[in-house]
């Protein structure tokens, strides 16, 4: 299960569209759904300058990472676009206050603190995120498991870090059990059945924040934009009538491996090479297997996994799951789910592309496709 970094992606110009597996929860980007009241943003800043291509760009540190918005104005004034971006960033702040395990005052932290206690009321959004998490956990056989956090807290991946002791992991491993997330749809209440159990929604909540920010922009009439948060990306519409393109960063060196034409879909990439440490000659990467509490063994891990889905919420969670499964099992899972697409780079550097994505992937002969060499790059996902 990923604790932190998500492989950087790069953004340029071109487009296509694919849906993601259905879930019993509402689409976080449903346009007719009213956006909840976000916390009052800071006083409005001056509108971002309009760039030569007719876009404005802004970024902010939220949910422990960098969120950015690239918005094509069309014939709208920059002041309106700037106000829409401010509102979208405020929406991300609101999501963080609900679903961040890092904020002691968040609703999720309060649920964690109540682990082993009685059922308690949950906000509709947290309830839906947990319900969706359970659906994906079951679909992936536990490769995605938000209850990993009880063990995940034992790991640090900063330079000079050391692994936890095996007995420390063994003592916490029984707390990793998505089935022990109890939800009552009739009352909207929930609880964690095991004392000491902790949820970490970093592998789904950032995607949800991206989706909600994109929804705010659409509701304000800005249908052409890219919202990115720590490597979780949602691409909406086009830029000046030309589809956007997302470039897949090479895991071994700077530059784009290939580019994916994208419009009205999400693209999320997970990689194990950006956040790791070495101890006594062994490499420990940040992607943890919920079944063992240890990082994925290097011999069965992928260098990077890119997953495409209808929204960033699903793509976020499925990218984690496929990375945990490993290249062969992960690609087989994707091929068995028509609403997912993937690009996987295995440990040997071989590139695996899901069947339906192969015709649309742009393979430059010697360099990234035109326009993809100077993209807005997603940052390393923060822990």
Question: Which positions does each model-derived feature cover?
Answer:
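Mature catalytic core of soluble alpha/beta enzymes
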Residues: 2-11, 15-383
């Amino acid at each position: 299960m990923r604790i932190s970094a998500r492989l950087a992606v790069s953004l340029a110009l071109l487009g296509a569209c694919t849906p993601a597996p259905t879930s019993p929860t509402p689409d976080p980007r449903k346009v007719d759904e009213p956006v909840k009241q976000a916390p009052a943003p800071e006083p409005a800043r001056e509108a971002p300058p309009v760039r030569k291509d007719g876009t404005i760009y802004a970024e902010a540190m939220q949910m422990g990472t960098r969120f950015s918005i690239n918005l094509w104005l069309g014939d709208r004034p920059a002041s309106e676009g700037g106000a829409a971006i401010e509102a979208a960033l405020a929406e991300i702040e609101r999501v963080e206050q609900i679903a961040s395990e890092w904020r002691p005052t968040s609703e999720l932290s309060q649920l964690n603190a109540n682990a082993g206690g009685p059922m308690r009321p949950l906000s509709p959004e947290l309830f839906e995120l947990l319900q969706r998490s359970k659906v994906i956990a079951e679909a992936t056989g536990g490769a995605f498991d938000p209850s990993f956090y009880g063990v995940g807290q034992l790991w640090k991946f900063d330079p000079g870090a050391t692994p936890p002791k095996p007995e420390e992991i063994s003592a916490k491993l029984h707390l990793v059990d998505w089935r022990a997330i109890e939800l009552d749809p009739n009352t909207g209440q929930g609880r964690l059945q095991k004392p000491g159990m902790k949820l970490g929604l970093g592998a789904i909540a950032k995607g949800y924040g991206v989706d909600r920010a994109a929804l705010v922009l659409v509701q304000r009439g800005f249908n052409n934009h890219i919202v990115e948060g720590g490597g979780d990306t949602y691409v909406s519409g086009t830029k000046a009538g030309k589809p956007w393109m997302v470039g897949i960063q090479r895991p071994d060196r700077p530059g784009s491996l290939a580019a994916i034409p994208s419009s009205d879909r999400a693209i999320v990439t997970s990689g194990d090479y950006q956040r790791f440490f070495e101890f006594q000659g062994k490499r420990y990467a940040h992607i943890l297997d919920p079944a063992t509490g240890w990082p994925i063994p290097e011999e069965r891990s992928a260098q990077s996994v890119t997953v495409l889905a209808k929204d960033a919420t699903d793509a976020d969670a499925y990218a984690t799951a496929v990375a945990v499964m490993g290249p062969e099992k992960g690609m087989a899972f994707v091929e068995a789910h028509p609403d997912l697409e993937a690009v996987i780079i295995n440990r040997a550097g071989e590139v695996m592309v899901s069947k339906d994505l192969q015709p649309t992937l742009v393979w430059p002969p010697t360099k990234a496709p035109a326009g993809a060499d100077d993209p807005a790059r997603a940052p390393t996902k923060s822990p």
